[in-house]
Amino acid sequence: MKTVNVCDFFSSPIGLGHVTRDIAIVKNIKNISINFVTGSGAAEILRKLDYKIDDVYNPPSFIVENGILNNQTKWLWNYFQYYKNCKKISEKIIKINNSDLIISDEDFASLTVAQNLKIPNILITDVLETKFTKGIASFIERKMNKSM
């Protein structure tokens, strides 16, 4: 079994729940260099706690009113573009850091890259399928769900 020395920990920057649980997890990991990859408010929290971070993710904004996502098709398109961009970003970081392990808290782009590069990876999630959209956009969303 290969020893893990370097771990890139990709934490979704959407909301603060991901980074909160990720900090609790990292506090229990010893003798491994951890580099967080995230953005937005999550990056600010990690920076204040003196974690090593790459603040590189800028997710699309979204508006929810009465439990309904506004502009669903537009948001889905923006999220798909964000995902493609995150794949490029995560591949660059993983290769530069020569990572031995990838931990992904709902960052599916880094997970895909890790699997393509045959790097051991761990997914942290509480979502098995999204249901943000209705109508024609839901067909695209279902296809994206299958790719996760």
Locate the predicted segments by residue:
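Extreme N-terminal starter segment of soluble prokaryotic enzymes
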Residues: 2-8
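A short, glycine/small-residue-rich beta-strand->loop->alpha-helix junction that serves as a flexible
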Residues: 10-23
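Conserved nucleotide-sugar phosphate-binding/catalytic loop shared by glycosyltransferases and other
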Residues: 13, 35-83
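A short, Lys/Arg-enriched amphipathic alpha-helix followed by its capping loop at the start of a domain
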Residues: 25-33, 45-46
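Short, hydrophobic beta-strand segments that form beta-sheet elements in well-ordered domains
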Residues: 33-38, 101-104
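An aromatic- and histidine-rich active-site surface loop
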Residues: 44-45, 102-117
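Conserved nucleotide-sugar donor-binding subdomain of glycosyltransferases
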Residues: 71-101, 108-109
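Active-site-proximal region of nucleotide-activated glycan assembly enzymes
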Residues: 120-148
